[in-house]
A protein has these predicted regions:
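N-terminal periplasmic "start-of-domain" segments of outer-membrane beta-barrel proteins
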Residues: 89-121, 150-155, 206
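Extracytoplasmic beta-strand/coil segments of soluble accessory domains associated
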Residues: 94, 110, 127-161, 183
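N-terminal periplasmic accessory domains that precede
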Residues: 126-129, 143-144, 181, 193-215, ...
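Short acidic/polar hinge/loop motifs at secondary-structure boundaries
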Residues: 160-186
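Transmembrane beta-barrel wall of Gram-negative outer-membrane proteins
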Residues: 222-255, 267-316, 335-353
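Face-selective signature of the C-terminal outer-membrane beta-barrel domain
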Residues: 288-310, 334-481, 503-509, 626-634, ...
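Outer-membrane beta-barrel signature, preferentially recognizing the C-terminal barrel domain
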Residues: 333-342, 389, 442-449, 518-581, ...
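Gram-negative outer-membrane beta-barrel transporters
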Residues: 581, 585-588, 606-703
Length: 781
């Protein structure tokens, strides 16, 4: 009965606060009958998509609130008849380690960024935070470490691999506790981290009652765009609960200028220009409830859930100009759809004694998405593509830790995952005839099983020496029995791992870290699937396309890329959370995968077609040098800036080199790895004013990449700048304004790319998005 009363009281407090926030936000944004959160109707006719509908869902919870109100801890008779007694309030003081202390105490090299970094610019999505982190940049394939993405950089959510379809660009920083940038793989986490891992730790449950609200406005295409983030943490007895909620919308525009020199519709050389305008709009929400129950002093049960859903539309319109010949143009396009992610993890922790601990986890994941795309020529439908994806997974993991003597902590664990994916898509022409009759409309079903087992020993050799030894075996099998595109692929990797730390003094102000690791990159299901995707510019399968406009197919015979790595870093921890670090890394890679393009006779076309397909191409080497410096200016440069007590500086500079053995130099680098990158940032408290300002400048130079003996890829220099100003309005309220230029929301920086062939054919694309302004109001309620 006591637990029942506690739960109902807790529910009432949560629902009351949520209802107040929803009511306040609704009236703030909807002063009239026409709400600013407009309805977006994807062409696929999905459900109504007003943000106010989400608040309507709170009304459905009202019976629970009423039920909670009917229950009180003490009866009315008890309340009126008992004398009022003074109660000594229990005050809990919680000391939590900061980001610098956590980094210093880690047994392997990692950078940790907490609340200060997450909140500094009032960002609305996690990718905007990540692109300012040292050694991290953001491109079309998401965040990249050391210039390597597309599977080389592993994304983790609470230490587990992020499920397919998880959108970091739709995850609010207010729902994140901290971000860990891990330079080398460890035994407890998946070894699919050739470049490293980015571990996103979602909001944790605390024993303090907290309530925070963030209201934001951001510049959009036609009007300001709203976003709201609310989080509440409550604690009653042994129960702790947290509920972060995020609502967001976007409406942005990107301009593209595309120049082409390639064969036209008649097979003869042609020159063309296209000025494109891409407009994207949509809305979505994230909800991440977490519950902790302390069964006893030794046992804890935790439930962590995450729900994400959004609707989107995208339209591209071109103005075409034929400079010479009969060029082929990209079609105008209208597309829309939705995505949805659901995730739940249950964790049981039992501390048998001070020396023993077991942790067992079980989880379920679901992803759903659907889309339709119309290619238009002269206003008429040229192609119609519709599809949907369904991804379901069950995970189970556990680990047992045992303190052996006073110096060793032994850990053994397992990590199991069973994932099933169902894809279905159909492409028809304007007359409704299937483009590829033998493939269209067929459901692609695949199953992926991942099994990992590991052991680890953390050895405290002395107060100055630490050694972390681990061994992990990970096996991934992918299988599909689809008759048209069968897949059967198995990969198994044994990864020995060693991390050594030497502290020059027991206080750990200076240390050297070294790691020797074996990691790998496994091919995804889409790369294994041999189902062809016809290039939208050359849909006539009786005609040969071009090298620069190839069809795409997968390769079921791909082997995993293997990497042996060495990392060495020196870290000097300064006063006031300052740090200086310099590190080097080296990776030897085998079975490197590269998309290769060649002319083939294929079963689905009567004419030869240019096909691009991933293949295990060659071996490669990559290495780099990384610097990081941050701290108070008066500590870093006392003679020059000793008077600037409120000025903090942050900087990073990284140099990268790579070479693929099968390609001639000098630009035979790994895909997308820039020669160097830099970040320079500051924040300053203005003396005599309740105001803090700051900024960040990121620079990546232009570079060339040799894709093959026939193709070169060129990329221009990119620069992005961020500025912010923050003013506290009261002890519990602050106003923040931020601006960014040179970047695209949810995308790569502004710039141009050039794909050039040895025969002189090329495609050049310039992308530009307007600067963004963001205003946020933070309140502790």
């Amino acid at each position: 009965m006591k637990c029942h009363l506690i739960l109902n009281c807790l529910t009432l407090r949560l629902l009351t606060k949520i209802a107040h926030i929803a009511f306040f936000w609704f009236h703030m944004n909807c002063p009239s009958s026409t709400c600013a959160w407009h309805k977006i109707c994807p062409i696929s006719q999905h459900k109504p998509t007003k943000l106010t509908d989400l608040f309507g869902a709170l009304v459905l919870l009202s019976p629970f609130a009423v039920f909670a109100q009917d229950v009180s801890v003490g009866s009315p008779a008890e309340s009126s008849g008992s004398p009022q007694t003074s109660v000594i309030q229990r005050v809990e003081i919680v000391a939590r380690q900061g980001s610098t202390e956590l980094r210093r105490a880690a047994s392997f090299a990692k950078q940790i960024y907490g609340r200060e970094e997450l909140d500094r610019y009032g960002d609305t999505n996690a990718l905007d935070v990540m692109r300012r982190l040292p050694g991290v940049n953001v491109d079309t394939d998401g965040p990249r470490m050391r210039g390597l993405g597309a599977g080389y950089t592993q994304i983790l959510i609470n230490g587990d691999p992020a499920p397919p379809g998880f959108n970091l660009d739709q995850l609010s920083p207010s729902q994140i506790e901290r971000i860990e940038v891990i330079k080398a793989s460890t035994a407890e986490q998946s070894s699919q981290a050739v470049a490293g891992s980015i571990n996103v730790i979602l909001k944790e449950v605390t024993r303090r009652s907290l309530s925070n609200l963030r209201l934001g406005l951001r510049t959009g295409k036609d009007r300001p765009l709203g976003n709201v983030n609310y989080s509440i943490t409550e604690s009653v007895g042994p129960f702790n609960m947290s509920l972060p909620i995020s609502l967001f919308e976007w409406h942005r525009q990107v301009r593209n200028l595309v120049d082409r020199k390639m064969a036209g519709s008649d097979g003869q050389p042609a020159l063309s220009e296209q000025l494109g305008t891409g407009t994207s709009q949509g809305w979505g929400y994230n909800v991440a409830p977490r519950f902790n129950f302390k069964v006893s002093d030794e046992q804890t049960i935790a439930l962590a859930t995450f729900f994400q859903k959004g609707y989107w539309n995208y339209r591209t319109d071109y103005v075409n100009q034929a400079v010479s010949g009969n060029p082929v143009f990209d079609d105008d396009a209208i597309q829309g759809g939705y995505w949805e992610n659901r995730r739940g993890n249950l964790t049981w922790i039992n501390r048998f004694s001070e020396d023993q601990r077991i942790e067992i986890k079980a989880g379920v994941q679901q992803s759903r998405s659907a889309f339709d795309l119309r290619n238009l020529r002269a206003g008429a439908t040229q192609l119609l593509t519709a599809g949907n994806n369904q991804d379901d997974a069950v995970t189970q993991a556990g680990k047992y830790s045992q303190l052996l003597g006073s110096a060793h902590t032994f850990t053994a664990g397992w990590d199991l995952e069973n994932r099933e994916r169902l894809e279905k898509r159909t492409t028809t022409n304007g007359a409704g005839i299937a483009l590829l009759s033998s493939f269209e409309g067929q459901a692609f079903e695949a199953q992926m099983r991942r099994q990992a087992y590991y052991i680890q020993d953390e050895w405290e050799i002395s107060p100055q020496w630490q050694l972390n030894l681990g061994l992990r075996n990970e096996r991934i099998s992918s299988e599909s029995k689809n008759a048209a595109v069968p897949v059967a692929n198995v990969s198994s990797v044994l990864s020995p791992l060693a991390h050594l730390t030497y502290k020059f003094d027991p206080k750990s102000r200076d240390m050297v870290r070294a790691s020797l690791t074996r990691s790998y990159k496994a091919a995804g299901l889409n790369a294994l699937l041999a189902r062809p995707v016809i290039n939208s510019a050359y849909t006539n399968i009786n005609q040969t396309n071009t090298y620069l406009a190839p069809d795409r197919i997968g390769n079921a015979a791909l082997s995993p890329e293997l990497a042996t790595g060495l990392d060495i870093a020196y870290e000097n921890y300064l006063s006031n959370d300052g740090i200086f670090s310099v590190g080097i890394f080296h990776r030897n890679l085998t079975n490197v995968v590269r998309n290769l393009t060649e002319l083939r006779n294929v079963s689905w076309a009567t004419a030869p077609r240019w096909i691009t397909q991933p293949q295990n191409f060659s071996d490669a080497v990559t290495r780099g040098l990384e610097f990081e410096l941050r701290g108070r200016a008066s500590d870093l440069m006392p003679q020059l800036l000793g008077h600037a007590k409120g000025l903090n500086l942050r900087s990073s500079l990284s140099f990268y080199r790579s070479s693929i053995a099968a390609l001639p130099g000098p630009d035979n680098r790994l895909d997308g790895q820039q020669p160097w990158s830099s970040n320079l940032g500051f924040d300053q408290r203005i003396s005599g004013l309740p105001l803090s300002v700051g900024g960040n400048l990121s620079i990546t130079p232009g570079y060339d990449t040799r894709q093959s003996a026939e193709q070169m890829f060129k990329r221009s220099t990119t620069k992005s700048i961020d500025l912010f100003a923050m003013m506290p309005l009261s002890p519990t309220m602050s106003l923040r304004a931020a601006a960014s230029a040179g970047v695209q929301q949810f995308g790569p920086p502004n710039g141009n790319t050039l794909s050039l062939l040895s025969n002189g054919d090329y495609v050049r694309t310039d992308r530009y998005a307007k600067p963004q302004l963001n205003i946020t109001l933070d309140m502790r309620l």
